[in-house]
């Protein structure tokens, strides 16, 4: 759980910015969005396969570009 202690001389904006940074660092929002709706295991598997294929295609493109130079 993220907690932010605000000093007397510290402004609200600065404390809010620090809070947002801590949340981003701990990936709380990303995890919440991922779990917001139920996804079937088959859907998750299909998404992972598509992501893998995209990564492989990107690697191939970069390699071809590197060799072409």
Curated annotation (Swiss-Prot):
Gene3D superfamilies in alphabetical order: Ribosomal protein S8 (1.20.5.1150)
Source taxon at top rank: Bacteria
Stored InterPro entries: Ribosomal_bS21, Ribosomal_bS21_CS, Ribosomal_bS21_sf
Xref: Pfam families: Ribosomal_S21
Keyword Iron: no
A single cellular component GO annotation: ribonucleoprotein complex
Protein name: Small ribosomal subunit protein bS21
Organism this protein belongs to: Borrelia hermsii (strain HS1 / DAH)
Lineage, opening ranks: Bacteria, Pseudomonadati, Spirochaetota, Spirochaetia, Spirochaetales
């Amino acid at each position: 759980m993220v907690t932010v202690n605000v000093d007397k001389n510290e402004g609200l904006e600065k404390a809010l910015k620090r809070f947002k940074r801590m949340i981003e660092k701990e990936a709380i929002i990303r995890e919440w969005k991922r779990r917001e709706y139920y996804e079937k295991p088959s859907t998750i598997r299909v998404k992972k396969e598509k992501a893998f294929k995209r990564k492989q295609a990107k690697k191939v493109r970069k390699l071809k570009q590197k060799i072409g130079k």
